[in-house]
Amino acid sequence: MTVKVAAGRGDAGTRLLAGASGVGFILAICGSNAMTPLLPGYMDRHGFGPAAAAVLFATYFVALIVILLISARGPLIRHTRTVLPIAFLTAIVGDLVEIVGAWYPLLLFPGRLMTGASVALSTGAAAAMMVAARGERGRAFMATGSLIGAGTGLIAAILIAVYLPWQLVTVYAVHAVAMTICLGFLFAGLRAAPDLLAPDRDPVPTVVEPELADVPSAHTGDLDVVVESSRSRDPGAYLVGALAWAIGALAVGAMPNAILATGISDSLLVAQCVGGACLIVSMLANFAGVGLRVITTLPAVGSLLALGWSIAIAGLAMGRLEVILLGTVIGGIGQAGGYRVALAYITVGLTPIQQGRVAATFSAFAYSGAGVMVVLDGVAGQLAGTIGGAVTIGVVYAVTSAIAIGLVLRRTRRTAQPAVTRPVDRETADTAS
């Protein structure tokens, strides 16, 4: 049986609420990268070592993962209309705390926790809101919004940090102002669309009779990724999603520091752009159709992720910026496909509330992988040196990718005979046999 969700009413209030929710979620993701180009500055100003910088960067994941897991198991998603304003307000307070952290370094950690909390609270809530407002067209929003937010947030943070004064303050101030404006639009949307996702009003899915049902497909936009059954518990898909987010975290949270530490370049702008190319290319690849029309299988994106990061590590060991850049570009293409396709596979046919919960679980797992990889990279760099630590984590990443691909292929073999559900398909299958 195929489950389809009808889109919400197309009135102005619904559009305003959906728009404010979507833009706010993207801005929250942007805020998660505000600190990225500032890490070398914190290392110089506060005397942080590689491990301390990695822990500071990864502190964001702690609150994020805990809240996402609570959202997936508890009633938070059913209170989307309350959770979203709290999420946006938390992001604003986190920015203010991190501004003060320029003078009091210990405050950077609770500020980073608040940033993670804001992303976590908005993740499931925005997913539910977008599906309720836009129907199936909103189902792919989480992957698209995450990639857009990560890419644009990093670009903006780099430009502000390099070209504007008071870099440890200005980045957060700009983000806080943008979030405040979006919060105002969100309140206006909530008032204009009082019935959309009101408590205890999960939209009733449209059930299509089995004999008339299409083969279930994970809607990613222009392309339907065909699956034979629900993959909401597919470990391979979850692991590919974690690898996709981990490569972005490693590229922007670890690689620029490694480039500067090894003397491959002494330019903050160059180091950030080489590492940040992963997220920037990921965002552009998303618009170019990666995960939509090309590279739409989990083994393909898993292979790209492993290949990309292996090339980047080889470039770091050789001291060649162009090789590192090639690796981060390939990894960015893999990230765009990996996160989007994996999320599409595990959320096929879900209602808005189910979508929010599964998306929250998936995001928690993906961010867990990113946080673990970044912390391990920092610890390995502290113990074995910059190059030795990077090579160690590169091997761990490649092995994990191989395991993920193996799990996906094993699942695919078990479901190699798809069910033919439409009469016309049965006739075609009989003719072919």
Q: What does each model-found stretch correspond to?
A:
Residues L343-T386, G394:
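A late C-terminal transmembrane helix in Major Facilitator Superfamily
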Residues V66-A102:
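Conserved MFS/SLC helix-loop-helix module at the cytosolic interface between two early adjacent transmembrane helices
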Residues L121-R134, A336-L350:
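Intracellular juxtamembrane helix-capping segments at the cytosolic ends
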Residues F141-L190:
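Helix-loop-helix hairpin linking two adjacent transmembrane segments in secondary transporters
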Residues L106-L121, E322-G337:
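Hydrophobic core of transmembrane alpha-helices in multi-pass small-molecule transporters
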Residues T82-L96, T297-A312:
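Structural signature of the two symmetry-related core transmembrane helices
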Residues A271-V294:
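Transmembrane alpha-helices of Major Facilitator/SLC transporters
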Residues G111-S146:
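Cytoplasmic helix-loop-helix junction between adjacent transmembrane helices
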